[in-house]
């Protein structure tokens, strides 16, 4: 019986959290920033619907670039280890260099995408005071609380 009450209490908490999250999302989407974000998402979706092949091609190209970078790194390290040209310290340095190159390439890709979308950019400035959720423990089971009301 106690297990069932805990399960009901947990379900009630999940229901409350879900409801509060839904209300918070609905409130946000009704604000100017929320409406702007929704409009931007709709525009992006429309652009995708108009030319999905362009988006797919872009994703394929970027995936191919990252794949080549990873493969080149693997074979570079493998060859150097086999020939004895690479020590443990050298391998760590090489790994750092390749990681830096990968991060730089990723940043460039994001910068390209950001530059394309800069015109329609929406800045959402939320802080912790925007949403308040009171999630306190209940001492009594849900069924007892419901019986009292």
Curated annotation (Swiss-Prot):
Principal place of residence: membrane
Protein's membrane topology: Single-pass membrane protein
Protein name (database record): Uncharacterized protein M6_Spy0510
Subcellular location as annotated: Membrane
Keyword set, alphabetical order: Membrane, Transmembrane, Transmembrane helix
Example of a GO cellular component annotation carried by this entry: membrane
Spans through the membrane: 12-31
InterPro entries: YtxH
